[in-house]
């Protein structure tokens, strides 16, 4: 197996990733007739896992176990799930779900983390340490990131989805467009800005300064005793 630093999963396979040194490995656990229908290959530093073209398949079990020294990208397109078995230590990484698949895994340590959902999938992770955190939920998916330590955080929700953050950050920028919710009342920021367009809600926690802008029926609730820059409506104390 050639070296790779990115993982791309298409369709319905479930993948577990283990970070370990040495040559990368890929193990497939399924029935023999399914193995021949899979398309697993490395191209442009990316391990692609999916099915061959024009294949319709049903199966009881399909698990792909992957190990590699480092990952800088994880992308799920479809209904497959990816689990980080023993955490992940890397520099910059982009994690994305498009469709109904899920990504889970704890203990992520990186420089910059860009993590996003487009569709109905979910992302769940705890114990994240990074410098720059970018969070995006577009669609009806849910993202839950617990015990995060970041320097700068930008989080946005567009649609009916939900993003839940806990932990701490020096500075945060929050935005909601649509009916979604951004719940960060347990995510302590020194400085924060919160913008709502539509009927969604933001709950946040700021210690030093909070800027709020709302349009529509949405609202912003806050914890802490920050200096406030806010309009006449749409802000309330938690």
List each language-model region with its residue ranges.
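Short, surface-exposed interaction patches in beta-rich subdomains
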Residues: 126-128, 132-134, 141-238
